[in-house]
Amino acid sequence: MSFAFSKVEFEEVEFQTLDKLTLKARLYSAAKRGPALVMNPGYNCTKEISAPSAAAYFQSKGITCLIYDPRNCGQSDGTPRREIDPHRQVDDYLDAMTYMSGLDIVDPDQIGFWGVSFSASIALAAACYDPRAKCIITVSPWTFDFGITAAEAKDNFSRLVAEREAQALGNEPFYTAMVDEEGNNPIHVNVDWGDEVRAAVNEFVSLSADGFVPTVTFQSYYKLFTFSPYLSLKFLGDTPLMMVVPEHDTVCPVEQQVKLYDAVEGPKEIYHAEGKRHLNMLAEDKFFEPMMKPQVEFFFKVMRGEAI
């Protein structure tokens, strides 16, 4: 089935992961065969949220884009529902790459990875492990820096292990809201989510075709604690990176994103997005095109084999 909104066309598609899950996706085909980007939305988000504005922009510049619902989310397969597993999501980028490489509209030698917020660090890790990715674009990457003490972490681990034991005894997974009424996150990490995240979550409910649900399994947080984008950076090698950093990010402070950028030793570019915050990065305001244009320029520079 094909849809068109404001002259933006996409096709509903699906592909399989190595462990036989079906992931539902949108394919934004360019006007002719050529380069492509594998894209994924943010934490517990679906393909209808945030990323479509970027995909449509890339499409208009001749880049085919694939956005897919992460495993366990939206219309994609996987259980427990809304269990966020960064390690498996890295794997899914590789399977999305395999799918994209087989499409007639795509040049398999000109595919990059793209991610925003949570998925930016997932895409970065995937690019470290998949030599087929010719570049990686990370937009407002969440760096998994929890900003808590060892004692605070132990308290979280005690609660997570207790819930894991409850599941082992036959109880259903426990679900927790992404943010409470005060905008606090359930594991009390030192991150300023507050009003911005709470407002975004309310908006996301109206955007998702499959009904965005603002809860995740409590065990998702165990999986977050076991992941770090820094662990894979040594394998990125000469794959070019572009990082887009919002001027006013409080969800993942600018200095944390720049620290991650500085840890990359290979070819790289950074763009500081004027007027942008973490959760309005892809809103089509007056700052949108100035933020998207450098990404397109970087992408085609890489595809032409020019030095970064």
Swiss-Prot record:
Presence of the UniProt keyword Transferase in the record: yes
PANTHER family hit by this protein: DLTD N-TERMINAL DOMAIN PROTEIN (AFU_ORTHOLOGUE AFUA_8G00380)-RELATED (PTHR47751:SF2), SUPERFAMILY HYDROLASE, PUTATIVE (AFU_ORTHOLOGUE AFUA_2G16580)-RELATED (PTHR47751)
Domain AB hydrolase-1: 35-159
Family named by the database record: Belongs to the polyketide transferase af380 family.
Pathway: Secondary metabolite biosynthesis; terpenoid biosynthesis
This protein's name: Acyltransferase drtE
Biological processes, Gene Ontology terms: terpenoid biosynthetic process
